[in-house]
Each structure stands twice: as C-alpha cells, then as structure tokens.
From Swiss-Prot:
Annotated family: Belongs to the RecU family.
A single Gene Ontology CC term: cytoplasm
Name under which the protein is recorded: Holliday junction resolvase RecU
EC number: 3.1.21.10
Role this protein plays: Endonuclease that resolves Holliday junction intermediates in genetic recombination. Cleaves mobile four-strand junctions by introducing symmetrical nicks in paired strands. Promotes annealing of linear ssDNA with homologous dsDNA. Required for DNA repair, homologous recombination and chromosome segregation.
UniProt record, GO biological process: chromosome segregation; DNA recombination; DNA repair
Annotated positions binding Mg(2+): T87, D89, E102, Q121
Site (Transition state stabilizer): K104
Reactions that this protein is recorded to catalyse: Endonucleolytic cleavage at a junction such as a reciprocal single-stranded crossover between two homologous DNA duplexes (Holliday junction)
Main location: cytoplasm
Compartments it resides in: Cytoplasm
Free-text comment on the cofactor: Binds 1 Mg(2+) ion per subunit.
Region (Disordered), start-end ranges: 1-30
Length: 208
C-alpha cells in the first residue's frame, strides 16, 4: 500500500502486537515522547472529567528568599527556590480509598536507582500505608518505554536493602516480578487505576 504521494507505507512493528507477561492487547500506543508526569496528568484529567476519581499532583514547595514591595498593596518575589518535597507526588480519592503515590522515570535500561527516593518520602508512604491507604510507585523505564506499578509493600524490602547498603538499585526483573505492568492505550493514556484495582484486591487478600 502507498501513501497519496507515492511513498510506501511501512508498519511500525514495535507498536503492533506488543504483549508483556500475558497481556493480550493488540495495540500498544507507547509513550510517544511524553514524560511520565504528562501521561499521568492526562489520565487524571480523564478520571476527573468522568467522575471516576479525584487525583492531583501536589504542588512543589517554594522557599521565598527575597520580596520587593513597590507598593503597600503589592509584593514582587525577586528570589525563590524550589524545596525538596516532603511527601509524594500525587494523592487523591478513588472509590472511597485514599491513594498516595510517587512517580519516577529513569534512563537506566536495567535497574531503578534508589537514590531517586528520599527517606522522608518513604516515611510518608509508610505512614499512609499504616492507615490502610493504597500506596505505590509508578516507575517508567524510558529506554524500554515500559511503566510499572510497584506496591509500597513490595518496595519496602528494596528500600531496607538500600538502607543497609546491600544494594543501591532495583533491577528491572525484580520490578517485573514484584510489580504490575501498565500498558499504554488511547484513553486514558495510562490507565493505572485498572492496575490499582488489582492491587487493592491482592492486598485485601494478603491482609486477611
């Protein structure tokens, strides 16, 4: 088959028939150059507009250093710095359940470096988990164009291993074994709540 300009049509084999761990989807739309944050933003808008869930990205805290007051009723910030977030990236409500999660991307092909996480973030995740919150990480391997949901309950052992200076990263294979693969699709782009449903079911069985 040819395009109207006479050039041949070449099928992108990397995006057709792609499956993973038993996935049967015939089409994988792929990241298409977007960041994980943008994919989540588009998905959250989809969930919100259809009354499925209310999930938002937490604003990054800012440390104001210098303020100028040209008028009594006005203030101009001349200097400010982004502070290290004290909690996770996202939180919200889904079917009456509190969700709290961190989103991370890595260019590494074989592992996820744990120095991307901060101890205060992990403490926050632990506190939410102890209150029966649904807590997890969304990890994207950019070079592989693969996204995984890693439950906090499974992440804990890797973090403890990191603290003990046994191993400073989590391999792709460990994440595949302990997490859930999330395929890209048309709408929402990253339907991670479908995977959250599986996580809630699995954790409810584990906690019984």
């Amino acid at each position: 088959m040819n395009y109207p300009n006479g050039k041949p049509f070449n099928r992108n084999k990397s995006q057709v028939g792609r499956t993973h761990k038993g996935q049967t989807s015939k089409i994988d739309y792929g990241g298409r150059g977007m960041s994980l944050e943008k994919d989540i933003e588009l998905s959250n808008d989809y969930y919100l507009n259809r009354g499925i869930a209310v999930i938002h990205k937490k604003p990054t805290p800012i440390q104001i250093v210098n303020v100028h007051y040209p008028m009594r009723s006005k203030a101009v910030i001349n200097e400010a710095y982004f502070r290290t977030p004290s909690t996770t990236d996202y939180n919200g409500i889904y079917h009456g359940r509190y969700l709290d999660f961190e989103a991370k991307e890595t260019k590494n092909k074989t592992s996820f470096p744990l120095n991307n996480m901060h101890e205060h973030q992990v403490r926050h995740m632990e506190a939410c988990y102890q209150q029966q919150g649904v807590v997890f990480l969304l990890i994207r391997f950019k070079s592989l164009d693969e996204v995984y949901l890693l439950p906090y309950a499974n992440f804990k052992k890797f973090w403890e291993r990191h603290i003990q200076e046994i191993k400073k990263s989590v391999t792709v294979e460990e994440i595949r074994k302990n997490g859930y693969y999330i395929p890209y699709q048309y709408q929402p782009r990253l339907n991670y709540l479908k995977t959250v449903d599986k996580l809630i079911l699995d954790e409810s069985e584990d906690r019984v």
